[in-house]
Curated annotation (Swiss-Prot):
Signal peptide range: none
Subunit record text: F-type ATPases have 2 components, CF(1) - the catalytic core - and CF(0) - the membrane proton channel. CF(1) has five subunits: alpha(3), beta(3), gamma(1), delta(1), epsilon(1). CF(0) has four main subunits: a(1), b(1), b'(1) and c(9-12).
Keyword Transmembrane helix: no
Keywords linked to the UniProt accession: ATP synthesis, ATP-binding, CF(1), Hydrogen ion transport, Ion transport, Membrane, Nucleotide-binding, Thylakoid, Translocase, Transport
Name of this chain's protein: ATP synthase subunit beta
EC number(s) recorded for this UniProt protein: 7.1.2.2
Compartments in which it is found: Cellular thylakoid membrane
Record-listed ATP binding positions: G162, G163, A164, G165, V166, G167, K168, T169
Species this chain originates from: Trichormus variabilis (strain ATCC 29413 / PCC 7937) (Anabaena variabilis)
Task of the protein: Produces ATP from ADP in the presence of a proton gradient across the membrane. The catalytic sites are hosted primarily by the beta subunits.
Gene, per the UniProt record: atpD
Length: 482
């Protein structure tokens, strides 16, 4: 959605390189940085054009350089370009719920126009320091490994780190299913440079679970903003800001607690690096844009909780080649309250969700926040798994029989703990055939205490695999014996 200035300011295209377009304006009439420009009309081949570009640089000699928000196919030099006099603006408020938008805030779900008057520009300052809310509180997700080892902060930022195909999107879909249905507030999902198929699956999943009510959109609890893999880098670079702007309105004006899901934050960085060289910037480490820290900071600092309302954000972060030291994930780490790291090794063992219990962290896991019982159980689980990890080399070389009695017991319990950290998901029912489970935090803590205390030493480890709470594991063991 692009607003037009009263006095039309018209320029013409002088150069097109991929998604980057140079435009010449009359002297003294240059648009401002981040202004939206529109290119409409017909080219020489008779193609209808309707394109929005965003000003990135003022080059001198009355020329500006802009990045296109959709494909530049069919553009030719000399075409007219109109300055709208304002940044890209997107619709906000209740009318956005249950709808799918593109980066410009145009609905793309074939359900007609959005009937609301209010729009906001996607470029806005972050809240002031004095407006921030700092009281820590934890919210329950119903996923055992998350609630026990990396509790999520209400109004915090959580990263889901993982390489290709280890289950980031599935965990995110499960979190949307669990939290959006339990949480009662509103959610915004920004699909940044991910697969179109997953976007479609997610939409259908939400209609089934009732998060989107197709018959009465006002009762829906989520707004979706998509800029998929096949879109030009301009769209992928800005779609996160479009989603965030919708979330900010719910927080600041409606004074609501909002959930913001971003899948995938790496694609936002990747899109920035794709256009960076075309904008004439020198690449920095590993070919990323030199403005990497600023780009990520401008997005992340707006995702925060104020005294008016909160934004709790869950962001998937693709890790290139499983290397957590890559500049993109490393820069994102600095902004997060909790990190849920997914492990390819666990995924290969078939343990889903493949959350690494030793590599994942949370600033919330402190006795004065979660309580002593939760804290001590979580640390005991981690130390048992750490000891098992240390013993694995000895087991590989000498075998289990060479371990002391005590170490053998630790290994047996660690293997049970590892399996009990797996869980059937509601959103994966179609693939696994097992009904999904939501496990309350107290049941999670009780279950791990029983395993570590030795109460369940005589049960086979297979009984703990892909179950909900500990009673299900005991029932499964009975079945296996029977």
């Amino acid at each position: 959605m692009v607003t037009t200035a009263e006095k039309t300011n018209i320029g013409y295209i002088t150069q097109i390189i991929g998604p980057v377009v140079d435009v010449k304006f009359p002297s003294g009439k240059l648009p401002q940085i981040y202004n939206a420009l529109t290119i409409k009309g017909t080219n020489e081949a008779g193609q209808e054009l309707n394109l929005t570009v965003e000003v990135q640089q003022l080059l001198g000699d009355n020329q500006i350089r802009a990045v296109a928000m959709s494909s530049t196919d069919g553009l030719v030099r000399g075409l007219e370009v109109v300055d709208t006099g304002a940044p890209i603006s997107v619709p906000v408020g209740k009318a956005t719920l249950g709808r799918i938008f593109n980066v410009l805030g145009e609905p793309v779900d074939n359900r007609g126009p959005v009937n609301n008057q209010e729009t906001l520009p996607i470029h806005r300052p972050a809240p002031k320091l004095t407006e921030l809310e700092t009281k820590p509180s934890v919210f329950e997700t119903g996923i055992k490994v998350v609630d026990l080892l990396t509790p999520y902060r209400r109004g915090g930022k959580i990263g889901l780190f993982g390489g290709a195909g280890v289950g980031k999107t599935v965990i995110m879909m499960e979190l949307i299913n669990n939290i959006a249905t339990q949480h009662g507030g509103v959610s915004v999902f920004a699909g940044v440079g991910e697969r179109t198929r997953e976007g479609n699956d997610l939409y259908n999943e939400m209609i089934e679970s009732g998060v989107i009510n197709k018959d009465n959109l006002n009762e829906s609890k989520i707004a979706l903003v998509y800029g998929q893999m096949n879109e030009p880098p301009g769209a992928r670079m800005r779609v996160g800001l479009s989603g965030l702007t919708m979330a900010e309105y719910f927080r600041d004006v409606n004074k609501q607690d909002v959930l913001l899901f971003i899948d995938n934050i790496f694609r936002f960085v990747q899109a920035g690096s794709e256009v960076s060289a075309l904008l004439g910037r020198m690449p920095s480490a590993v070919g990323y844009q030199p403005t990497l820290g600023t780009d990520v900071g401008q997005l992340q600092e707006r995702i925060t909780s104020t005294t008016e309302g909160s934004i709790t954000s869950i962001q998937a972060v693709y890790v290139p080649a499983d290397d957590l030291t890559d500049p993109a994930p490393a820069t994102t780490f600095a902004h997060l309250d909790g990190t849920t790291v997914l492990s390819r090794g666990l995924a290969a063992k078939g343990i889903y969700p493949a959350v690494d219990p030793l590599g994942s962290t949370s600033t919330m896991l402190q006795p004065n926040i979660v309580g002593d019982e939760h804290y001590n159980t979580a640390r005991a689980v981690q130390s048992t798994l750490q000891r098992y990890k240390e013993l694995q080399d000895i087991i590989a070389i000498l075998g289990l029989d060479e371990l002391s009695e005590e170490d053998r017991l630790i290994v047996a319990r660690a293997r049970k703990v590892e399996r009990f950290l797996s869980q059937p998901f509601f959103v994966a029912e179609v693939f696994t055939g097992s009904p999904g489970k939501y496990v309350k935090l107290e049941d999670t803590i009780k279950g791990f205490q029983k395993i570590l205390s030795g109460e369940l030493d005589d049960l086979p480890e297979q009984a703990f695999y892909l179950v909900g709470d500990i009673n299900e594991a005991i029932a499964k063991a009975e079945k296996l014996k029977g």
